[in-house]
Amino acid sequence: MSPAGIRNRALQLAALYSPGGDTIRPMLHRRRGVKIGRRTWVGFDTLIEPSYPHRVEIGDRVALGIRVLILAHFAHLGRNRESASGELDDRVSVRIEDDVFIGPGAIIMPNVTIGHGAVVTSGSVVTRSVAPLTMVQGNPARPIARCGVPLGLDTPIKEFYAHLTPIASTSAT
């Protein structure tokens, strides 16, 4: 492993277990190359793309719950867009826009955008992009509600629930 790779892994391990979800953890991930906006919370034991951190972009006022996993490539499946030299290109693979809430244990797969104000419920697996102000749930994650207001760190939960509109299920029961 190269010195840069060792540095990346050391910063990643420090970020997993450091205190300071809104201070130290985001700062360590920024040093790894993850683009992280202001006032973003990174939960304990959250793993953000181990090998290609520069392929992840996280907006302002985002909350990542405990044990969130964000993957930005599939090296072993050969789905990467590689350059002629065999290296991954520098395109962002995972984009999390402003005011997004991602619940504990959620998994974000490569090549998705999570739109402004979206909510990913706990344990969900996001395999496709999520529309702005939409709540998704399940494996694979599917839209279950429209959010009238983002679930921000400063948003009273009663206000969030008051503006939540369920999406009618299209599946037969």
Q: What do these predicted ranges mean?
A:
Residues 59-65, 117, 121-123, 133:
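Outer-envelope exported proteins of Gram-negative bacteria
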Residues 25-27, 43-113, 139-140, 146-149, ...:
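Flexible, glycine/small-residue-enriched loop-and-beta-strand segment within the central core
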Residues 136:
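Conserved active-site beta-strand element of glycosyltransferases/polysaccharide synthases
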Residues 34-36, 96, 114, 130:
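Hydrophobic beta-strand core residues of beta-sandwich domains
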Residues 1-33, 39, 61, 74-77, ...:
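Terminal amphipathic alpha-helical/low-complexity segments used for targeting or macromolecular assembly
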Residues 72, 121, 127-128, 144-146:
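Conserved acidic donor-binding loop of glycosyltransferase catalytic domains
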Residues 104-128:
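Beta-rich strand-turn-strand
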